[in-house]
Amino acid sequence: MFGNIGWGEFMVLLVAALVILGPERLPGAVSWVTKSLRQVREYASGASQQLKDELGPEFEDLRKPLADLNQLRGMTPRAVITKHLLDGDDSILTGNFDKPGSVSFDKSNPGTKAVSADPSTPTAPQNKPLAAGERPPIDLDAT
């Protein structure tokens, strides 16, 4: 209910309520607000229960289309294309064309490779760190 109000705004509202209502009327106002919220909650739950009672088994038939609509509300254009046109494969959109068994680069930690579980995939030999003053080997094919 108060998802869009941060702590700073909430504190400003409390200080404003204290200044406007004063310390003697503030507890009464807080109790009135809590009673009102409880009453609204009871009305809402009573209305939903009354709807379930009146519709009976048809209520479940109504819930299915509503659940489908609720699922579509969170869909972005990219998610719709991925789900319906690409069968869930978003490699075209993300550019990640690695196969599940291949070695892929970890984007969160540059310079490291993810280890694959496939033993047939060849791996590069592990390089030892260079000693102080040692020059790195030169690859003549790369230069």
From Swiss-Prot:
It comes from the Bacteria. GO terms for cellular component: TAT protein transport complex. It is a single-pass membrane protein. The chain crosses the membrane at residues 2-22. The keyword Membrane applies. It is found in: Cell membrane. Residues 97-143 are annotated as: Disordered. GO terms for biological process: protein transport by the Tat complex. Its main location: membrane. Keywords: Cell membrane, Membrane, Protein transport, Translocation, Transmembrane, Transmembrane helix, Transport. One of its GO terms (molecular function) is protein transmembrane transporter activity. Belongs to the TatB family. HAMAP family: TatB. Part of the twin-arginine translocation (Tat) system that transports large folded proteins containing a characteristic twin-arginine motif in their signal peptide across membranes. Together with TatC, TatB is part of a receptor directly interacting with Tat signal peptides. TatB may form an oligomeric binding site that transiently accommodates folded Tat precursor proteins before their translocation. The Tat system comprises two distinct complexes: a TatABC complex, containing multiple copies of TatA, TatB and TatC subunits, and a separate TatA complex, containing only TatA subunits. Substrates initially bind to the TatABC complex, which probably triggers association of the separate TatA complex to form the active translocon. This is Sec-independent protein translocase protein TatB.
